[in-house]
Amino acid sequence: MNRPFNDQPIETLIDQNLANEGTVLDLRLKYISDDGMEFLSSCPKLVSLQELKLERNDITDKGIQILAGSTILTGIKSLNLERNSIGDEGVRSIALSPSFSRLTSLNLWKNEIGSDGAKAIADSLILGNLQRLDLAKNKIGDDGGKALAESQTLTSLKYVDLFGNGISQETQEIIKESLNFKNLQHLVLE
């Protein structure tokens, strides 16, 4: 297996960073890349995983597609993919994968997500339990912002961060006034 940036194999990283009786795995800044996602997605030790932190790991759409196809990681409630290289295809994989039906928190801050990725989230029947969505510092634009505001499935959201997405003032008002965000307690637009 390829060794990540910190020169430890993924097997060792999992052993060292798996916590809370196997429910939390924190691999932030380990640079496991898409190759590490292969092992992670098929590791039987992770069958009880509920929280997965993968910030800054050089993960692309390919790695997310591998994760979305996992038959082991089906109980994840919180997924942090902050500061990777995930685009619309990767987000579409998350939005369509039954493995993510329990997600309540999805952090995609500072990736490469455009309006199609935001639309995939907005249209997802899988992500109806989401309470927290962070899409800050992506490129969803007005079309992506409107799609989220018009979503019939994201009604459980309590926190949404869309800062730094090139969303116009007009679309920001549409988002603020969305009746679909009836449970929203915190909205970040600028």
What are these regions (language model features)?
Residues 17-24, 45-51, 71-78, 98-105, ...:
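Leucine-rich repeat
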Residues 39-45, 66-72, 93-99, 120-126, ...:
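C-terminal per-repeat helix/turn "cap" of leucine-rich repeat
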Residues 77-125:
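Eukaryotic tandem repeat interaction scaffolds
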